[in-house]
Amino acid sequence: MLTVLITGGAGYIGSHAVYGFLDAGYKVVVVDDLSTGIRENLAPAAQLYQGNIADRDLLDTVLRQHTIDGVLHFAGSAAVPESIVDPARYYRNNAFRSLDLVDFLVSRGVKRFLFSSSAAVYGMPAGGAPVSEASLLNPINPYGWSKLFVERMVRDVSAVSGLNYGILRYFNVAGSDPKGRTGQSTPNATHLVKVACEVAVGKRDGLRIYGTDYDTPDGTCVRDFVHVTDLALAHVATYEFLCRSGRNACFNCGNGKGHSVREVIRAVEQAHGHTLHVAAAERRQGDPATLIADATAIRKMLGWRTLYGLDDMIHTALAWEHREQRDLMQVS
Protein backbone atom coordinates (compact mmCIF):
# COMPACT_ATOMS: atom_id res chain seq x y z
CA MET A 1 0.00 0.00 0.00
CA LEU A 2 1.50 3.32 -1.10
CA THR A 3 1.44 6.28 1.29
CA VAL A 4 0.82 9.81 0.05
CA LEU A 5 1.19 13.07 1.95
CA ILE A 6 -1.53 15.63 1.30
CA THR A 7 -0.89 19.22 2.38
CA GLY A 8 -4.05 21.20 3.12
CA GLY A 9 -5.96 17.94 3.41
CA ALA A 10 -8.57 19.37 5.78
CA GLY A 11 -9.58 22.06 3.29
CA TYR A 12 -12.39 21.95 0.76
CA ILE A 13 -10.66 20.32 -2.20
CA GLY A 14 -8.00 18.63 -0.09
CA SER A 15 -10.52 16.78 2.09
CA HIS A 16 -12.22 15.38 -1.00
CA ALA A 17 -8.85 14.31 -2.41
CA VAL A 18 -8.13 12.51 0.87
CA TYR A 19 -11.28 10.45 0.45
CA GLY A 20 -10.44 9.88 -3.21
CA PHE A 21 -7.07 8.37 -2.37
CA LEU A 22 -8.38 6.35 0.57
CA ASP A 23 -11.15 4.96 -1.63
CA ALA A 24 -8.48 4.01 -4.19
CA GLY A 25 -6.54 2.00 -1.60
CA TYR A 26 -3.82 4.43 -0.56
CA LYS A 27 -2.69 5.29 2.94
CA VAL A 28 -3.01 9.05 3.50
CA VAL A 29 -1.06 11.37 5.80
CA VAL A 30 -2.15 15.02 6.07
CA VAL A 31 -0.32 18.20 7.07
CA ASP A 32 -2.72 21.08 7.71
CA ASP A 33 -2.49 24.02 10.10
CA LEU A 34 -6.32 24.21 10.25
CA SER A 35 -6.25 27.96 9.61
CA THR A 36 -9.05 27.44 7.09
CA GLY A 37 -9.30 23.65 7.05
CA ILE A 38 -11.84 21.85 9.23
CA ARG A 39 -10.69 18.92 11.36
CA GLU A 40 -14.18 17.37 11.31
CA ASN A 41 -14.12 17.23 7.49
CA LEU A 42 -11.00 15.09 7.46
CA ALA A 43 -11.46 11.36 6.88
CA PRO A 44 -10.94 9.41 10.13
CA ALA A 45 -8.60 7.00 8.33
CA ALA A 46 -6.17 9.80 7.46
CA GLN A 47 -3.45 10.67 9.96
CA LEU A 48 -3.27 14.41 10.67
CA TYR A 49 -0.14 16.32 11.60
CA GLN A 50 -1.33 19.78 12.59
CA GLY A 51 1.09 22.45 11.51
CA ASN A 52 2.37 24.64 8.70
CA ILE A 53 4.22 23.37 5.65
CA ALA A 54 6.93 25.92 6.49
CA ASP A 55 7.77 23.89 9.63
CA ARG A 56 10.66 21.73 8.47
CA ASP A 57 10.88 19.93 11.81
CA LEU A 58 7.27 18.83 11.39
CA LEU A 59 7.86 17.69 7.82
CA ASP A 60 10.99 15.85 8.90
CA THR A 61 8.94 14.03 11.54
CA VAL A 62 6.36 13.02 8.94
CA LEU A 63 9.01 11.70 6.56
CA ARG A 64 10.78 9.79 9.33
CA GLN A 65 7.57 8.16 10.53
CA HIS A 66 6.19 7.29 7.09
CA THR A 67 7.57 6.10 3.77
CA ILE A 68 6.04 8.80 1.58
CA ASP A 69 5.76 7.85 -2.08
CA GLY A 70 4.58 11.29 -3.18
CA VAL A 71 3.05 14.59 -2.13
CA LEU A 72 -0.16 16.31 -3.22
CA HIS A 73 0.09 20.00 -2.47
CA PHE A 74 -3.17 21.85 -1.74
CA ALA A 75 -2.08 24.10 1.15
CA GLY A 76 -2.22 27.82 0.42
CA SER A 77 -4.45 30.86 0.08
CA ALA A 78 -7.16 30.83 -2.57
CA ALA A 79 -9.31 33.99 -2.78
CA VAL A 80 -8.65 36.16 -5.83
CA PRO A 81 -10.09 39.42 -4.37
CA GLU A 82 -8.05 38.97 -1.20
CA SER A 83 -4.89 38.44 -3.24
CA ILE A 84 -5.36 41.87 -4.82
CA VAL A 85 -5.50 43.70 -1.47
CA ASP A 86 -2.88 41.52 0.26
CA PRO A 87 -0.49 40.29 -2.44
CA ALA A 88 2.41 39.70 -0.06
CA ARG A 89 0.41 37.08 1.80
CA TYR A 90 -0.29 35.21 -1.43
CA TYR A 91 3.30 35.22 -2.62
CA ARG A 92 4.41 34.12 0.84
CA ASN A 93 1.82 31.37 1.37
CA ASN A 94 1.55 30.08 -2.18
CA ALA A 95 4.87 30.77 -3.86
CA PHE A 96 7.65 31.00 -1.28
CA ARG A 97 6.36 28.24 0.99
CA SER A 98 5.81 25.96 -1.98
CA LEU A 99 9.40 26.59 -3.06
CA ASP A 100 10.67 25.66 0.40
CA LEU A 101 8.42 22.59 0.44
CA VAL A 102 9.62 21.28 -2.92
CA ASP A 103 13.25 21.99 -2.03
CA PHE A 104 12.84 20.03 1.22
CA LEU A 105 11.04 17.11 -0.44
CA VAL A 106 13.71 16.77 -3.12
CA SER A 107 16.44 16.81 -0.47
CA ARG A 108 14.65 13.93 1.29
CA GLY A 109 14.26 11.87 -1.86
CA VAL A 110 10.49 12.16 -2.37
CA LYS A 111 9.76 10.92 -5.90
CA ARG A 112 6.49 12.54 -6.94
CA PHE A 113 4.74 15.88 -6.54
CA LEU A 114 1.22 16.80 -7.67
CA PHE A 115 0.43 20.51 -7.57
CA SER A 116 -2.96 22.17 -7.16
CA SER A 117 -2.90 24.98 -9.72
CA SER A 118 -5.69 27.09 -11.19
CA ALA A 119 -7.26 28.41 -14.38
CA ALA A 120 -6.24 31.81 -12.99
CA VAL A 121 -2.91 31.28 -14.76
CA TYR A 122 -4.70 32.01 -18.06
CA GLY A 123 -5.85 35.49 -17.06
CA MET A 124 -8.40 36.92 -19.50
CA PRO A 125 -8.43 34.75 -22.65
CA ALA A 126 -9.57 36.58 -25.76
CA GLY A 127 -12.63 35.53 -27.70
CA GLY A 128 -14.27 33.20 -25.20
CA ALA A 129 -13.01 29.99 -26.81
CA PRO A 130 -12.08 27.09 -24.49
CA VAL A 131 -8.50 27.34 -23.24
CA SER A 132 -6.07 24.45 -23.56
CA GLU A 133 -2.88 23.77 -21.66
CA ALA A 134 -1.02 25.42 -24.55
CA SER A 135 -2.98 28.68 -24.30
CA LEU A 136 -1.27 31.93 -23.33
CA LEU A 137 -0.38 32.11 -19.63
CA ASN A 138 -1.07 35.67 -18.53
CA PRO A 139 -2.35 35.99 -14.94
CA ILE A 140 -4.07 39.23 -13.97
CA ASN A 141 -3.94 38.98 -10.17
CA PRO A 142 -1.44 37.93 -7.48
CA TYR A 143 -3.27 34.65 -6.88
CA GLY A 144 -2.81 33.62 -10.52
CA TRP A 145 0.81 34.78 -10.55
CA SER A 146 1.57 32.86 -7.36
CA LYS A 147 0.23 29.68 -8.96
CA LEU A 148 2.16 30.23 -12.18
CA PHE A 149 5.34 30.88 -10.20
CA VAL A 150 5.01 27.49 -8.51
CA GLU A 151 4.33 25.78 -11.84
CA ARG A 152 7.52 27.27 -13.30
CA MET A 153 9.52 26.45 -10.19
CA VAL A 154 8.36 22.81 -10.15
CA ARG A 155 9.31 22.39 -13.82
CA ASP A 156 12.76 23.88 -13.27
CA VAL A 157 13.45 21.82 -10.14
CA SER A 158 12.30 18.69 -11.95
CA ALA A 159 14.72 19.38 -14.80
CA VAL A 160 17.73 19.14 -12.48
CA SER A 161 16.47 16.72 -9.80
CA GLY A 162 14.31 14.25 -11.71
CA LEU A 163 11.26 15.02 -9.54
CA ASN A 164 8.22 13.46 -11.22
CA TYR A 165 5.49 16.11 -11.21
CA GLY A 166 1.90 16.71 -12.17
CA ILE A 167 0.08 20.04 -12.43
CA LEU A 168 -3.71 20.29 -12.41
CA ARG A 169 -5.33 23.58 -13.40
CA TYR A 170 -8.79 23.75 -11.85
CA PHE A 171 -11.65 25.72 -13.26
CA ASN A 172 -14.66 26.55 -11.00
CA VAL A 173 -14.92 23.84 -8.37
CA ALA A 174 -18.32 23.22 -6.77
CA GLY A 175 -20.41 20.64 -4.95
CA SER A 176 -19.72 18.27 -2.08
CA ASP A 177 -19.03 14.57 -1.58
CA PRO A 178 -22.15 12.69 -2.79
CA LYS A 179 -21.81 10.35 0.21
CA GLY A 180 -21.96 13.32 2.58
CA ARG A 181 -18.58 12.60 4.17
CA THR A 182 -17.13 16.07 3.59
CA GLY A 183 -18.05 19.32 1.91
CA GLN A 184 -17.23 22.98 1.60
CA SER A 185 -17.03 24.67 4.98
CA THR A 186 -14.83 27.53 3.79
CA PRO A 187 -15.27 30.62 6.00
CA ASN A 188 -16.26 33.76 4.07
CA ALA A 189 -16.52 31.76 0.84
CA THR A 190 -16.69 33.58 -2.49
CA HIS A 191 -17.53 30.60 -4.75
CA LEU A 192 -20.83 31.20 -6.58
CA VAL A 193 -22.48 27.82 -5.92
CA LYS A 194 -21.45 27.88 -2.26
CA VAL A 195 -22.68 31.44 -1.74
CA ALA A 196 -25.99 30.82 -3.54
CA CYS A 197 -26.61 27.69 -1.47
CA GLU A 198 -25.85 29.62 1.72
CA VAL A 199 -28.48 32.16 0.69
CA ALA A 200 -30.92 29.33 -0.02
CA VAL A 201 -30.62 27.90 3.51
CA GLY A 202 -30.65 31.30 5.22
CA LYS A 203 -26.97 31.67 6.12
CA ARG A 204 -26.78 34.84 4.02
CA ASP A 205 -29.43 37.42 3.17
CA GLY A 206 -28.61 37.61 -0.52
CA LEU A 207 -25.94 37.56 -3.18
CA ARG A 208 -24.61 39.90 -5.84
CA ILE A 209 -24.09 39.45 -9.54
CA TYR A 210 -20.89 41.29 -10.42
CA GLY A 211 -21.58 42.65 -13.88
CA THR A 212 -24.67 42.22 -16.04
CA ASP A 213 -23.37 43.82 -19.24
CA TYR A 214 -20.83 41.27 -20.46
CA ASP A 215 -20.81 40.09 -24.06
CA THR A 216 -22.52 36.81 -23.16
CA PRO A 217 -26.04 35.50 -23.89
CA ASP A 218 -27.53 36.89 -20.65
CA GLY A 219 -24.95 39.56 -19.83
CA THR A 220 -23.36 37.69 -16.91
CA CYS A 221 -20.03 35.89 -16.74
CA VAL A 222 -19.83 32.34 -18.09
CA ARG A 223 -17.75 29.79 -16.21
CA ASP A 224 -16.83 26.11 -16.41
CA PHE A 225 -17.96 24.31 -13.24
CA VAL A 226 -16.47 20.97 -12.17
CA HIS A 227 -17.68 18.79 -9.30
CA VAL A 228 -15.15 18.50 -6.49
CA THR A 229 -15.46 14.70 -6.49
CA ASP A 230 -14.62 14.59 -10.20
CA LEU A 231 -11.62 16.74 -9.36
CA ALA A 232 -10.55 14.35 -6.59
CA LEU A 233 -10.75 11.47 -9.07
CA ALA A 234 -8.64 13.50 -11.51
CA HIS A 235 -5.93 13.69 -8.84
CA VAL A 236 -5.98 9.94 -8.33
CA ALA A 237 -5.85 9.31 -12.09
CA THR A 238 -3.00 11.78 -12.57
CA TYR A 239 -1.01 10.40 -9.65
CA GLU A 240 -1.37 6.86 -10.98
CA PHE A 241 -0.25 8.10 -14.40
CA LEU A 242 2.91 9.52 -12.80
CA CYS A 243 3.57 6.23 -11.03
CA ARG A 244 2.89 4.15 -14.11
CA SER A 245 4.75 6.17 -16.72
CA GLY A 246 7.35 8.25 -14.89
CA ARG A 247 6.33 11.10 -17.19
CA ASN A 248 5.40 14.61 -16.08
CA ALA A 249 1.95 16.02 -16.83
CA CYS A 250 -0.08 19.22 -16.86
CA PHE A 251 -3.85 19.04 -17.31
CA ASN A 252 -6.88 21.31 -17.29
CA CYS A 253 -9.69 20.04 -15.07
CA GLY A 254 -13.12 21.20 -16.19
CA ASN A 255 -16.34 20.05 -17.82
CA GLY A 256 -15.70 21.83 -21.09
CA LYS A 257 -19.13 23.47 -20.79
CA GLY A 258 -20.03 26.98 -19.72
CA HIS A 259 -22.82 28.15 -17.41
CA SER A 260 -23.61 31.80 -16.77
CA VAL A 261 -23.98 33.29 -13.31
CA ARG A 262 -27.72 33.72 -13.89
CA GLU A 263 -28.03 30.09 -15.00
CA VAL A 264 -26.40 28.89 -11.81
CA ILE A 265 -28.63 31.05 -9.64
CA ARG A 266 -31.75 29.80 -11.44
CA ALA A 267 -30.59 26.21 -10.96
CA VAL A 268 -30.14 26.79 -7.22
CA GLU A 269 -33.59 28.39 -7.04
CA GLN A 270 -35.11 25.42 -8.84
CA ALA A 271 -33.39 22.91 -6.55
CA HIS A 272 -34.30 24.91 -3.45
CA GLY A 273 -37.85 25.71 -4.53
CA HIS A 274 -37.67 29.41 -3.69
CA THR A 275 -36.42 32.62 -5.27
CA LEU A 276 -33.13 33.99 -3.94
CA HIS A 277 -32.54 37.65 -3.15
CA VAL A 278 -30.13 38.80 -5.87
CA ALA A 279 -28.71 42.28 -6.47
CA ALA A 280 -26.76 43.54 -9.46
CA ALA A 281 -23.37 45.12 -8.78
CA GLU A 282 -20.51 46.61 -10.77
CA ARG A 283 -18.06 44.35 -12.55
CA ARG A 284 -15.11 43.10 -10.55
CA GLN A 285 -11.69 44.05 -11.81
CA GLY A 286 -10.16 41.33 -13.95
CA ASP A 287 -13.19 39.07 -14.42
CA PRO A 288 -13.12 37.58 -17.94
CA ALA A 289 -16.49 37.36 -19.65
CA THR A 290 -16.03 33.67 -20.43
CA LEU A 291 -13.62 31.05 -19.11
CA ILE A 292 -14.11 27.45 -20.23
CA ALA A 293 -11.69 24.53 -20.16
CA ASP A 294 -10.51 22.50 -23.09
CA ALA A 295 -10.01 19.27 -21.13
CA THR A 296 -9.19 17.11 -24.15
CA ALA A 297 -5.72 16.21 -22.88
CA ILE A 298 -6.77 14.63 -19.59
CA ARG A 299 -9.61 12.78 -21.29
CA LYS A 300 -7.35 11.33 -23.99
CA MET A 301 -4.33 10.53 -21.84
CA LEU A 302 -6.02 9.31 -18.66
CA GLY A 303 -9.54 8.43 -19.73
CA TRP A 304 -10.87 10.83 -17.08
CA ARG A 305 -14.46 11.90 -17.54
CA THR A 306 -16.67 14.08 -15.38
CA LEU A 307 -19.42 12.07 -13.70
CA TYR A 308 -21.40 14.97 -12.26
CA GLY A 309 -23.14 17.93 -13.87
CA LEU A 310 -24.25 21.31 -12.55
CA ASP A 311 -27.45 19.94 -10.99
CA ASP A 312 -25.40 17.36 -9.07
CA MET A 313 -23.06 20.08 -7.84
CA ILE A 314 -25.99 22.11 -6.56
CA HIS A 315 -27.85 19.21 -4.96
CA THR A 316 -24.77 17.96 -3.12
CA ALA A 317 -23.82 21.50 -2.07
CA LEU A 318 -27.33 22.13 -0.73
CA ALA A 319 -27.29 18.81 1.11
CA TRP A 320 -24.03 19.82 2.80
CA GLU A 321 -25.42 23.22 3.82
CA HIS A 322 -28.48 21.54 5.36
CA ARG A 323 -26.25 19.10 7.21
CA GLU A 324 -24.12 21.91 8.62
CA GLN A 325 -27.28 23.66 9.79
CA ARG A 326 -28.48 20.51 11.56
CA ASP A 327 -25.10 20.02 13.20
CA LEU A 328 -25.10 23.63 14.40
CA MET A 329 -28.60 23.27 15.86
CA GLN A 330 -27.58 20.12 17.72
CA VAL A 331 -24.56 21.86 19.23
CA SER A 332 -26.57 24.92 20.29
Name each region found by the language model:
Residues M1-V173:
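N-terminal Rossmann-like NAD(P)+-binding domain of SDR-like oxidoreductases, especially those catalyzing
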Residues R39, F171-L192, G202-R223:
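Short, flexible, glycine-rich and Lys/Arg-enriched loop motifs at helix boundaries
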Residues I53, L136, N172-G175, T212-Y214, ...:
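Residues that form or immediately flank small-molecule/cofactor binding pockets and catalytic motifs
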Residues Y91, I140-L148, T182-K194, D224-F225:
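Short-chain dehydrogenase/reductase
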Residues V195, V201-S332:
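C-terminal substrate-binding subdomain of Rossmann-fold SDR/epimerase-dehydratase oxidoreductases
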